[in-house]
């Protein structure tokens, strides 16, 4: 957010607190003087509580901007400038003030809201009254040597905490006295840097309605600039002290009205700007964490600040109205000359913004709870060193702050001096030196992420994994380490119902519905405090209520840095008695049901020490080292709940004294939001009942007061129905995110010792028959006698954990349960994590032939171990034989719970488990047995056959897979609608029903079957022997065939060689006998070669021819011709 928008919000809040005195708690008109409520941005309202939507206020702002253009830079947020000037001692004039204002970071929304209370508390501080600037008071720095920090004694520190706590009650009286004193004094000449500003403002009129902010700047010898605010009367130009004294009572009522207006105005602005506050607070938390790590580097700087702190008041020529005196010294003739030896102006915290401080008080160490970067490293030692350093700073300031002679002047109306140690501590936490920002190493914990594209805003970094677009790159170890600490600091809040619903966790109280309920409850109590007697202040009491730091004591390892034998300053045994006076909380649900929460309600928080006007507004870091160690341990474990909650927090009797209102909380801090109150549950467990906190539930007692909110309440009570008066809607759970079938089959967490069940549909029908008058939900509910019941961690550790690494169960699609059984519905489970989990379990393959695990009903993971949910198993209808593991140990792969097939187990997608822990069916039956008044024991039924409880059903045709039997009505085709609605007794559900075969009942048939099996085995062995013999014969014949084939190949090769040789001989013969002609034949050639050779053969074989003298010469010639041919 820009500095302009931040400046606008800050100025409008401060001006709202300085409204007219007539706007008391009953008069709800516009706080802008002269505004009738018309022309507002929110046109549907006839009034408003904020100046943001007032057109008259905007018009006056524009007029003021024209007159203040010379000092526009100096008019950034007054509190921020005052805090920054108080923390950094490096400014020496108005130029430094302007540089500071430009360099102020707008990331710290939390300290800004906390500082606004201090601004509103400075109602008694100085304002220039006339243009001349004459002063009646001269502060003397040289005449009072006791104003140095070395003048304080150690005895002042013992009563300083109690004085601070009790002095906050009289801020209205201080404001009244400051208004009386304001008219009797004027301001002397200021330094030349601001004279022009004061003259311009005096020209515009000293009776400005919006309370201008002025800078009182010390001369060059004092390096401190303080911006203060002043209350101005709405009456034109007050002229005498008598006029102001006549309006003292009305002024005091006006201050109280403004305080109440500030609270409700802040609630409106929180609803409008929650997203911006979340972003700003995350940046602020990062700064605070890094600055506390660098506290040792700034120790020198803080010592210089403490030495220069008493010189905050301005130089010799600069005077103003002093308010360091106690309330008795404000009156009478001392108005014109208060004692000037008090030379330190500090910021006073007012009750007006006590709701912001009470939120940080609930978590006991809100400043330290932001340091989750060190939490992930487990750096407990560094936290304790930081806390010890703060304790030393507080002691050093308190021991050397003020002389004992001035302790007598400290009254209940002077929180100024005693708030100085808090100021010094605050300096070390909220210092905003721009040079420190460059030293930080702020980057996204996601590997490879540079901070761009985050959901949480445009700033280039973040310190949490929520909102990171590259969340799929995060290893499961880092994800689990970060997500486990990102929890809401409000005790009992799981992060649900927050305005920023895109994140399942948050680190601040803004947007938390439980914190909003506490704030509204506190406003009701303030109305009671206005009408009642103010509590007496005890300035001498050294016992003040510290914020309760609830730590798991048994889990804290013994550290050498703390003393286990030293008790804290305020014993926890007596804390309940002290809180007993202030713990009565009364709310009217009709006044805030739809405006605060919309359509969803969570249980309101228990009011503890923040409701007390005596509550100390800051954590005491210096009581002992043991509390420091407890605080550090609580910081490292943000999931710490109220383990040491006192059981009696109120003395008001309950409407139903026979029942104790219990809030059932498991170890994750999830409340039981069910509206169901069952008779049998009350009889079985008389000490347990559900805490009804739905504002949408109306009773006839308050129906006339809720006529204006009936429409939003009816839509909140049941989004599925527009009738809020239906009887069956009284007992429905608040969660309607699941359909009715899903809610019936949801694996519910159950335990006989402490029950936190959401009512099912079967419960609704039976409970709807109860008498309407027995259950009363009064409009004003007083939360008393709370007993927080935590479920056994040994049993719930396996039952209530999400398999996704780093998931605490919040934000699931399945509803408001603290856990779930599968990755489906988990917002943290993405494809990368599922693939990673599937890769680590490579043996998890679907037993269906040809199934690769895709298309399963149980999820999109790549494998499963059972046929249920497999689409291919249903199509084929085959019953697959058990795997090798099942054959080796069939008992190992079966769930001992009757009727359980291994689905939905926490241990994963396995088809079996060895115990009932993690079995959703066992949890469901345990709940049914508890509701029916009978106990459930799965071990006694380990060997029973699973059968369908529907009468006449043999298990066939079920919709939940290929199994023959089942133990629930879901998926049974023979179960009618009435049968589903009706309840079965525990005996009927758990009764053994064996269906034995007729074959197994006759021993003769068994023997006959065994004989047939033996005969078949013998015949099989004979056939196997014949088969072996045939196989041997076939192998020999194959060998002979191969030999014959080899011989044929050799013969073919020889034939080819002979053919080639014959061809050569024929060609040689043709060439030799080409010139020789036989009688009656043509010359030899390839065509007549065969005939020619036959003729020659006949001639040589025939002796007659051969001896014939005619043929003898021819034959000799032929011999000579063929003699050269070699064969």
Curated annotation (Swiss-Prot):
Stretches of Acidic residues bias are at 104-117, 260-308, 761-772
Where Zn(2+) 7 is bound, by residue?
948, 953, 966, 972
Q: Where in the cell is it found?
A: Nucleus
The record, for PROSITE patterns, names: ZF_CCHHC
Biological processes per GO annotation: cell differentiation; diaphragm development; endocrine pancreas development; intracellular glucose homeostasis; negative regulation of gene expression; nervous system development; positive regulation of gene expression; positive regulation of transcription by RNA polymerase II
Residue ranges under compositional bias (Basic and acidic residues)? Answer: 61-71, 82-103, 244-259, 348-360, 726-735
UniProt: Zn(2+) 1 binding residues? 30, 35, 48, 54
Alphabetically sorted, this entry's keywords are:
Developmental protein, Differentiation, DNA-binding, Metal-binding, Neurogenesis, Nucleus, Repeat, Transcription, Transcription regulation, Zinc, Zinc-finger
Q: Where are the zinc fingers (CCHHC-type)?
A: 21-64, 435-478, 479-522, 793-836, 837-880, 886-929, 939-982
Q: Which residues bind Zn(2+) 4?
A: 802, 807, 820, 826
Compositional bias (Basic residues) spans?
41-50
Bias type Polar residues, positions: 528-542
Residue stretches spanning the membrane = none
Question: Where do the record's region annotations for Disordered lie?
Answer: 1-157, 204-369, 520-542, 670-776
Per UniProt, where does Zn(2+) 2 bind?
444, 449, 462, 468
Q: In which tissues is it expressed?
A: Isoform 1 is more predominant than isoform 2 at all stages of development and adulthood. Expressed in differentiated neurons especially at higher levels in newly generated ones.
Keyword Metal-binding belongs to the record: yes
Biased segments, Low complexity type: 143-157, 703-725
GO CC term, one of those recorded: nucleus
**Binding positions (Zn(2+) 6):** 895, 900, 913, 919
Q: Binding residues for Zn(2+) 3, per the UniProt record?
A: 488, 493, 506, 512
Q: Which GO terms describe its molecular function?
A: cis-regulatory region sequence-specific DNA binding; DNA-binding transcription activator activity, RNA polymerase II-specific; RNA polymerase II transcription regulatory region sequence-specific DNA binding; zinc ion binding
Function comment? Binds to the promoter region of genes encoding proteolipid proteins of the central nervous system. May play a role in the development of neurons and oligodendroglia in the CNS. May regulate a critical transition point in oligodendrocyte lineage development by modulating oligodendrocyte progenitor proliferation relative to terminal differentiation and up-regulation of myelin gene transcription.
Cite the domain annotation text: Contains 7 zinc fingers of the C2HC class arranged in two widely separated clusters. These two domains of DNA binding can function independently and recognize the same DNA sequence.
Give the protein name, as stated in the record: Myelin transcription factor 1
Q: Which organism is it from?
A: Mus musculus (Mouse)
Upper lineage is: Eukaryota, Metazoa, Chordata, Craniata, Vertebrata
């Amino acid at each position: 957010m820009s500095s302009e928008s931040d400046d606008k919000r800050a100025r409008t809040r401060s001006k709202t607190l300085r409204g007219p005195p007539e706007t008391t708690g009953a008069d709800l008109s516009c706080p802008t003087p002269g505004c009738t409520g018309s022309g507002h941005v929110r046109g549907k309202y006839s009034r408003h509580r904020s100046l943001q939507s007032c057109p008259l206020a905007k018009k006056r702002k524009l007029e003021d901007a024209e007159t203040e253009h010379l000092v526009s830079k100096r008019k950034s947020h007054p509190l921020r400038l005052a805090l920054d000037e108080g923390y950094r001692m490096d400014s020496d004039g108005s130029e430094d003030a302007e540089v500071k204002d430009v360099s102020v970071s707008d990331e710290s929304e939390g300290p800004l809201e906390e500082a606004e209370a201090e601004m509103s508390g400075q109602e008694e501080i100085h304002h220039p009254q006339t243009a001349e600037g004459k002063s009646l008071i001269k502060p003397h720095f040289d005449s009072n040597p006791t104003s140095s920090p070395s003048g304080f004694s150690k005895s002042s520190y013992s009563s300083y905490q109690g004085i601070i706590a009790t002095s906050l009650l009289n801020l209205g009286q201080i404001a009244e006295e400051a208004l009386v004193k304001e008219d009797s004094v004027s301001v002397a000449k200021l330094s030349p840097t601001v004279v022009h500003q004061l003259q311009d403002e005096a020209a515009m009129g000293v009776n400005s309605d919006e309370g201008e902010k002025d800078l009182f700047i010390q001369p060059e010898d004092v390096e401190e600039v303080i911006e203060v605010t002043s209350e101005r009367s709405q009456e034109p130009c007050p002229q005498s002290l008598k006029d102001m004294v006549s309006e003292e009572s009305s002024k005091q009522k006006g201050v109280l009205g403004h305080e109440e207006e500030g609270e409700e105005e802040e609630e409106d602005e929180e609803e409008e700007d929650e997203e911006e506050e979340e972003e700003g607070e995350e940046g602020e938390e990062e700064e605070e964490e890094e600055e506390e790590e660098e506290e040792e580097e700034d120790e020198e700087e803080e010592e210089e600040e403490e030495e220069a702190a008493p010189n905050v008041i301005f130089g010799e020529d600069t005077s103003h109205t002093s308010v360091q005196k106690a309330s008795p010294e404000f009156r009478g003739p001392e108005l014109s000359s208060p004692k000037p030896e008090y030379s330190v102006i500090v910021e006073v915290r007012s009750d007006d913004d006590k709701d912001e401080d009470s939120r940080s008080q609930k978590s006991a160490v809100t400043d330290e709870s932001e340091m989750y970067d060190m939490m992930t490293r487990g750096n407990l030692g560094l936290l304790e060193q930081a806390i010890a350093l703060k304790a030393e700073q507080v002691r050093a300031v308190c021991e050397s702050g003020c002389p004992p002679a001035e302790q007598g002047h400290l009254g209940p109306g002077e929180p100024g001096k005693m708030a100085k140690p808090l100021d010094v501590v605050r300096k070390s936490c909220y210092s905003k030196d721009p040079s420190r920002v460059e030293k930080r190493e702020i980057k996204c914990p996601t590997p490879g992420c540079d901070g761009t594209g985050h959901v949480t805003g445009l700033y280039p970094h973040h310190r949490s994994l929520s909102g990171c677009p590259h969340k799929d790159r995060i290893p499961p170890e880092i994800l689990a380490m970060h997500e486990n600490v990102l929890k809401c600091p409000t005790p009992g809040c799981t992060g649900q119902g927050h305005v920023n619903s895109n994140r399942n966790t948050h680190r601040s109280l803004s947007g938390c519905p439980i914190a909003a309920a506490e704030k509204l409850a506190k406003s009701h109590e303030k109305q009671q405090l206005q009408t009642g007697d103010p509590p007496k202040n005890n300035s001498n009491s050294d016992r003040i209520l510290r914020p309760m730091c609830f730590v798991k004591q048994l889990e804290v390892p013994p550290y050498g840095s703390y003393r286990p034998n030293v008790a804290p300053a305020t014993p926890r045994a007596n804390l309940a008695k002290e809180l007993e006076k202030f713990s009565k909380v009364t709310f009217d649900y009709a006044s805030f049901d739809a405006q605060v929460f919309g359509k969803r309600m969570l249980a309101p928080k228990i009011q503890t020490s923040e409701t007390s006007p005596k509550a100390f507004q800051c954590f005491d870091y210096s009581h002992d080292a043991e509390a420091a160690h407890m605080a550090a341990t609580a910081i490292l474990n943000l999931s710490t709940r109220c383990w040491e909650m006192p059981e009696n927090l109120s003395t008001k009797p309950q409407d139903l004294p026979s029942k104790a209102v219990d809030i059932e909380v498991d170890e994750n801090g999830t409340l039981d939001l069910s509206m169901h109150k069952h008779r049998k549950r009350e009889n079985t467990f008389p000490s347990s009942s559900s805490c009804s906190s739905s504002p949408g539930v109306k009773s006839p007692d308050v129906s006339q007061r809720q006529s204006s909110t009936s429409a939003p309440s009816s839509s909140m009570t049941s989004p599925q129905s527009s009738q809020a008066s239906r009887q069956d809607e009284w007992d429905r759970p608040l969660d309607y995110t699941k359909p009715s079938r899903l809610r019936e089959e949801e694996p519910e967490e159950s335990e006989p010792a402490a029950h936190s069940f959401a009512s099912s549909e079967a419960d609704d029908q039976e409970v709807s028959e109860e008498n309407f008058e027995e259950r009363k939900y009064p409009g004003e509910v007083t939360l008393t006698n709370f007993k927080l019941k935590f479920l056994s961690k040994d049993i719930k550790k396996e039952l209530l954990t999400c398999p996704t690494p780093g998931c605490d169960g919040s934000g699931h699609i399945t509803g408001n349960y603290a856990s779930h059984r599968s990755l489906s519905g988990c917002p943290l489970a993405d494809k990368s994590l599922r693939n990673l989990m599937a890769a680590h379990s490579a043996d998890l393959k679907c037993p269906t032939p040809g199934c690769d695990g895709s298309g399963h009903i149980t999820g999109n993971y790549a494998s499963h171990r059972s046929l249920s949910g497999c689409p291919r198993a249903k199509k084929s209808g085959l019953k697959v034989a058990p795997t090798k593991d099942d054959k080796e140990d069939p008992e190992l792969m079966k769930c001992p719970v009757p009727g359980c097939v291994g689905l939905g187990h926490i241990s994963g997608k396995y088809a079996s488990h060895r115990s009932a822990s993690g079995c959703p069916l066992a949890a469901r039956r345990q709940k049914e047995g508890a509701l029916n008044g009978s106990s459930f024991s799965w071990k006694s039924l380990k060997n029973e056959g699973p059968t369908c409880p529907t009468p006449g059903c043999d298990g066939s045709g079920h919709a939940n897979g290929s199994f023959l039997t089942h133990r629930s009505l879901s998926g049974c085709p023979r179960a009618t609608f009435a049968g589903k609605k009706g309840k079965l007794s525990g005996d009927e559900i758990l009764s053994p029903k064996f269906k034995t075969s007729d074959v197994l009942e006759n021993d003769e048939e068994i023997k006959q079957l065994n004989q047939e099996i033996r005969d078949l085995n013998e015949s099989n062995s004979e056939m196997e022997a014949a088969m072996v013999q045939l196989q041997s014969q076939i192998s020999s014949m194959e060998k002979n065939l191969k030999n014959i084939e080899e011989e044929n190949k050799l013969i073919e090769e020889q034939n080819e060689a002979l053919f080639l040789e014959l061809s050569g001989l024929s060609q040689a013969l043709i060439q030799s006998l080409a010139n020789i002609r036989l009688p009656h034949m043509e010359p030899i050639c390839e065509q007549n070669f065969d005939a020619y050779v036959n003729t020659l053969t006949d001639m040589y074989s025939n002796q007659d021819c051969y001896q014939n003298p005619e043929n003898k010469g021819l034959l000799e010639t032929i011999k000579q011709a063929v003699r050269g041919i070699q064969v």
